[in-house]
A protein has these predicted regions:
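A short, Lys/Arg-rich alpha-helix, primarily the initiator
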Residues: 1-28
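Short, charged recognition helix plus adjacent turn
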Residues: 19, 71-83
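N-terminal small-domain helix-loop-helix segment of the aminotransferase-like
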Residues: 84, 93-185, 192
Length: 351
C-alpha cells in the first residue's frame, strides 16, 4: 500500500536532487503521451494526493528510481538515487572468527548437496547425540517460576556459591562470592574482561593456535593480540622462550587455554610454573580459559594455574557447556583470585 507521506517527501526530494521544476514534468509527460496536469503535480507536491499507479510509474521512470520505493514500499535500488551506505566498523578489519567463517559456509554448501558433514568447528555436544542429564532439565523447569525478574549483575547468589565451592576444590586462592561473575556463556565474560582492561595499543599474549574469540575480543577492545607458539613437536605446550621474547612494555596480560582448544593439550605443572614465573617477572595478569577442565582423559589431572600464583592477579574462566552438555543454556563464569589489591580499579571497571 502506498504511503502518502513518504511519497510526498521523496517526490519533493527528487525534484530538488534532479534540479527539476513542475513544468519539466509536464513537458516530459506530454512527450510520452501521459495525461498529467499542473494541478495534479501541485497536489503531489503539497501532499494532498498520491498519483495513480500508471502516473507514479511514469514519474519514477522520469526520475530514474524504483516506483515501489517512490510509493514508500521499499528502498531505492543501488544506483538509482544517492542513498547513504552503512559500512562495518573499521574495528572489524583485523577480526577473524574462523569457527563461523568461509570453511563453515563451504560445509553448509556441501550439506545442501547431500554430503554428510561432521561439524567439529564448535564444541556443541548436542548434534552428536550427547544429551543433557535429566536432573539438570528437571531442576531448570522447577526453578523457572522463580526466575522472572532480574538477578544481580554478577548472577544468582546460589549459583555463585556453588562456583566458589568448586574454586576451593581446585585450590584457587583468595576467592569470595563477590569475586565470581556468571555470564551468558564464557564468551560474554571474555569480551567483558578484555573491554574493561585494555586501552588502544595494549598487548595481550595469546596462544597460537588459539580459540579465535580471544584474539577477536582483544582486537575489538582496542588491544593487540601477540601470539606465542604452542609447538606440535613439543606436545603442543607453550614455548616459554617465545613468550619471553614477545613481552614488551605494552604487555598487560597473558592468556592460556588449558586444556587447550583446539589442540587438546593438557599442561603439566612444570609448564604452568614457568608461565607463572614469566607473569611474575613482568607483572602480568593471567587469564586462564578452563572450559574443558572436566573433560580430562587417561587418568590425567587438570591443574588450575591460579592455584600456583597466589601472589598474582588471575582470572579463571569455566562453565557447564561442555562438561554438562548444555551449550545452549549459556552458563559460564569467571573467577577473580590471588592478589586482588593490585587490580582494584580493574575490578571496579568490571562492575
Amino acid at each position: 500500500m502506498a504511503d502518502g507521506t513518504q511519497f510526498t517527501e521523496r517526490f519533493n526530494e527528487l525534484l530538488k536532487q534532479k534540479n527539476m521544476k513542475q513544468v519539466d514534468l509536464l513537458t516530459a509527460a506530454a512527450n510520452e503521451g501521459v495525461k498529467l496536469s499542473k494541478s495534479q503535480i501541485s497536489q503531489y507536491v503539497s501532499g494532498r494526493a498520491v498519483p495513480r499507479r500508471n502516473i507514479g510509474e511514469f514519474i519514477a521512470m522520469t526520475f530514474g528510481v524504483d516506483a515501489d520505493w517512490l510509493y514508500g514500499e521499499k528502498i531505492a535500488e543501488k544506483g538509482n538515487i544517492n542513498m547513504r551506505e552503512f559500512k562495518k566498523s573499521s574495528k572489524l578489519d583485523n577480526v577473524l572468527y574462523d569457527v563461523r567463517g568461509p570453511v563453515v559456509d563451504e560445509a553448509n554448501r556441501m550439506e545442501e548437496n547431500g554430503t554428510h558433514v561432521l561439524k567439529l568447528n564448535i564444541g556443541n555436544p548436542a548434534p552428536f547425540g550427547f544429551r543433557t542429564p535429566d536432573e539438570v532439565i528437571y531442576d531448570m523447569q522447577r526453578q523457572l517460576t522463580d526466575c522472572e525478574g532480574y538477578s544481580t549483575s554478577k548472577g544468582l547468589f546460589s549459583a555463585r556459591k556453588a562456583i566458589m565451592q568448586y574454586a576451593q576444590l581446585k585450590n584457587i586462592p583468595n576467592v569470595s562470592i563477590e569475586d565470581i561473575y556468571t555470564g551468558n556463556g564464557v564468551s560474554e565474560l571474555i569480551n567483558l574482561s578484555m573491554s574493561a582492561l585494555l586501552d588502544n595499543g595494549d598487548e595481550v599474549l595469546v596462544p597460537a593456535p588459539d580459540y579465535p574469540l580471544w584474539t577477536a575480543c582483544v582486537t575489538l577492545a582496542g588491544g593487540k593480540a601477540v601470539h606465542y607458539i604452542c609447538d606440535e613437536q613439543s606436545e603442543w605446550y607453550p614455548d616459554i622462550d617465545d613468550i619471553k621474547k614477545k613481552v614488551t612494555d605494552r604487555t598487560k596480560a597473558i592468556v592460556i587455554i588449558n586444556p587447550n582448544n583446539p589442540t587438546g593439550a593438557l599442561y603439566p605443572k612444570e609448564v604452568l610454573d614457568q608461565i607463572v614465573e614469566v607473569a611474575r617477572e613482568h607483572q602480568l595478569i593471567i587469564f586462564s580459559d578452563e572450559i574443558y577442565d572436566r573433560l580430562v582423559m587417561d587418568g590425567e589431572e587438570h591443574i588450575s594455574i591460579a592455584s600456583l600464583a597466589p601472589d598474582l592477579f588471575c582470572v579463571t574462566f569455566s562453565g557447564l557447556s561442555k562438561s554438562h552438555m548444555i551449550a545452549g543454556y549459556r552458563i559460564g563464569w569467571m573467577i577473580l583470585s590471588g592478589n586482588k589489591s593490585i587490580a582494584k580499579d580493574y575490578m571496579e571497571g568490571l562492575n
